[in-house]
């Protein structure tokens, strides 16, 4: 199979499989994913999130990921509980205040992340209300 001929979304899954089968993902290692859901349909986002959680559970890896997708975030939240690894999961929110970048642990208040992700849609709804 030539990876170049696949859609960007499928490449995400194929690359993950290649990392697994080649032994690149090691026990207690670290995986860094920057917006892995970016080219995925919402249904595939859920599947990819489940795979990431299962890999974390099986290999005990540390997963650092960044997302702007409420679907993906919610899937991570649900699957970490489903597979009993929610105690290993932390949630952080990045924000700027007074021109200083901050990262806050919001594990006990994940709603803060959802609220920030929902803001653009709320702004659009406000615009619609003014039409």
Region spans (language model):
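Switch/communication elements of ASCE P-loop NTPase nucleotide-binding domains
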Residues: 1-125
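Short acidic DE-rich linear segments
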Residues: 128-131
């Amino acid at each position: 199979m030539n990876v170049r001929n696949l859609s960007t979304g499928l490449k995400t899954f194929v690359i993950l499989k290649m990392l697994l089968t080649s032994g690149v993902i090691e026990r207690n290692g670290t995986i860094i994913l920057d917006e892995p859901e970016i080219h995925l349909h919402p249904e595939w986002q859920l599947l990819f999130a489940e795979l990431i959680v299962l890999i974390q559970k099986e290999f005990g890896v540390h997963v650092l990921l960044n997302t702007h997708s409420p679907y993906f975030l919610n899937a991570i939240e649900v699957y970490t509980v489903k597979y009993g690894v929610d105690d290993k999961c932390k949630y952080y929110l990045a924000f700027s205040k007074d021109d200083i970048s901050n990262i806050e642990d919001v594990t006990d208040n994940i709603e803060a992340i959802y609220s920030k992700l929902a803001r653009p849609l709320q702004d659009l709804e406000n615009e619609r209300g003014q039409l």
